[in-house]
Every structure is written in structure tokens, then in C-alpha cells.
UniProtKB/Swiss-Prot annotation:
This is Non-homologous end joining protein Ku. Homodimer. Interacts with LigD. It holds the Pfam family Ku. With LigD forms a non-homologous end joining (NHEJ) DNA repair enzyme, which repairs dsDNA breaks with reduced fidelity. Binds linear dsDNA with 5'- and 3'- overhangs but not closed circular dsDNA nor ssDNA. Recruits and stimulates the ligase activity of LigD. InterPro entries: Ku70/Ku80_beta-barrel_dom, Prok_Ku, SPOC-like_C_dom_sf. GO terms for biological process: DNA recombination; double-strand break repair via nonhomologous end joining. CDD domains: KU_like. Coiled coil: none annotated. Residues 10-194 form the Ku domain.
């Protein structure tokens, strides 16, 4: 597995060397954009339409923040790099511990497996056992890929998992959704609620993750495989016309050579 982050996790005076690995393998099917005529991948050039149609070199591109319409402040790469280093330490500290059910699932973002570095296996296992016994989550700050995250550390099967969580200001207010109904405007009858609850009970089953697959992705994969197979058949057949054309060309060349030779013989005979 590819290491996403490497450093130390501090629990009081105890330091645990850890590595983070992505827990999710997003095997999305990606398409390329090709030119219809020559099947060459489309390329996009960077240019400034108000200045030039020529492609702008990377050395002439700067980062900027738009603080008002068409008003920008330029961000120096050295300033950004220094700021990033100051807030991206290679050690993280558990801020506090919280109850396992205190965080709403909407706050969870990305998941990472936590593995110990050599020599820190026992400390790693100690933290895992303590979290399991207390049914708690460890709350931390961590910087991953140039962004600082709030995150939790919890037990997961045979190891530990780190899950980044959104900051409160990143979650939109559901009251901004238009036409949200309320009991005052749409009173629910007791028998309606009873029927809905009975239906939920009837359709309730244990969650078996292996029963659920990405049906669209499976169908798309099958379509792609069929197209590859069809193209392979076409490519295996396509050389035949070339061979026939070559044979015809060679035969025609032979006939022309015969004619030229016959004409030459006739001239010499005269």
C-alpha cells in the first residue's frame, strides 16, 4: 500500500510511530477525450484571453485569491510553502477523547488505515486495546496533502483507523432547503405513521455489504470489455486486405515488367 502520511502520534508522553494508508480504493472508470478524426487525445492549453492567445508558460503563472469581483491578491509560493510547513508537523497529538456516538455521520469525510512503524507495534496495540475497552474516539488535528483536518482515531477490525471530519462551518444548514415540510403544514395521521413503521420493520434486514455492488460500473465494464473484444476481432481480420492489396500490386508490377520486356524485345528485333 502507498503511504499517505508518516509521523508520530502522541498520547501524553507516549509517542507511537505511525503511517497512514488510504482505506478506500476508488477504482472509477475514466475516459479520455479524443479527436474524432485521428483519435488523438485532446490537449488544453493555458492562456490569458484578455492578453494573448499564446500558451502561457508555467513560470508566468501565479496563484491569486479573488476577494471581490475581478479583484485579486497575489499569493507568493514561498509564503504559502512556509505557512504549510508551519502547520504540517510530522507529529500529531490526541487533543481529547470523546464518546463513540458523539459525531454525526454527515461529518465524516475520508478514511485511512493506521499502521505502526517498526518498533512501535506494542504501543500501537496498547492504544487500540484502550480505545476498545473505553469505547472512545481520539480527537486530533492533522495536515494531509496541504490541508489541515480535524480527525478521529478509532478501532477498526484488527487495527486502527483515522477518519477526517468536516469542520462545522463546512456543513450547510438544512433549513436552507426549499419546501421543507413540517408537521404544522402537513399533519401526519396516527394510522399513516403506524403503517410506515410496520413497513420499515418488514423491510429491515442485517446489513450484508457483500450483497451490494455498483451495478452501473459492472454494466459499463462489460460494455467496455465487449468493445475491446470486437475491436480485437476487427484488428485480427484487418491485415488480410493489406496482404491482398500487396499481392495485387506485386502482380500488377510483374505484368508491367512483362509488357516492358516484350516491348523492348520487339524494338530490338526491329
Amino acid at each position: 500500500m502507498h503511504t499517505v502520511w508518516k509521523g508520530a502520534l502522541s498520547l501524553g508522553l507516549l509517542n507511537i510511530g505511525i503511517k497512514l494508508y488510504s482505506a478506500v480504493d476508488e477504482n472509477d472508470i475514466k475516459f479520455l477525450s479524443l479527436h474524432k478524426e485521428c483519435l488523438t487525445p485532446i490537449k488544453y492549453k493555458k492562456f490569458a484571453p484578455d492578453c494573448t492567445d499564446e500558451e502561457v508558460d508555467d513560470k508566468d503563472i501565479v496563484k491569486a485569491y479573488e476577494y471581490a469581483p475581478h479583484k485579486y491578491i497575489i499569493m507568493d509560493e514561498k509564503e504559502l510553502s512556509a505557512l504549510q510547513k508551519a502547520h504540517e508537523p510530522r507529529s500529531i497529538r490526541i487533543i481529547s477523547f470523546i464518546q463513540n456516538n458523539e459525531i454525526d455521520s454527515v461529518l465524516y469525510d475520508r478514511s485511512y488505515f493506521i499502521g505502526p512503524t517498526p518498533g512501535h507495534e506494542k504501543s500501537y496495540l496498547l492504544l487500540k486495546e484502550a480505545l476498545e475497552r473505553t469505547n472512545k474516539l481520539g480527537l486530533i488535528h492533522i495536515s494531509i496533502r496541504k490541508k489541515q483536518h480535524l480527525a478521529i482515531i478509532r478501532n477498526f477490525e484488527d487495527g486502527l483507523m483515522l477518519q477526517t471530519i468536516h469542520y462545522p462551518n463546512e456543513i450547510r444548514d438544512i433549513t436552507n432547503i426549499p419546501n421543507l415540510p413540517s408537521n404544522e403544514n402537513y399533519p401526519i395521521q396516527k394510522q399513516e405513521l403506524t403503517a410506515a413503521i410496520n413497513l420499515i420493520h418488514h423491510l429491515t434486514n442485517p446489513f450484508e455489504q457483500e450483497l451490494y455492488t455498483d451495478e452501473y460500473k459492472e454494466a459499463l465494464t462489460e460494455l467496455i470489455e465487449n468493445k475491446i473484444e470486437e475491436q480485437a476481432k476487427t484488428e485480427s481480420i484487418s491485415p488480410a486486405p493489406n496482404i491482398i492489396n500487396i499481392m495485387e500490386t506485386l502482380q500488377a508490377s510483374i505484368e508491367q515488367a512483362k509488357i516492358k520486356r516484350d516491348n523492348k524485345t520487339e524494338k530490338e528485333a526491329k
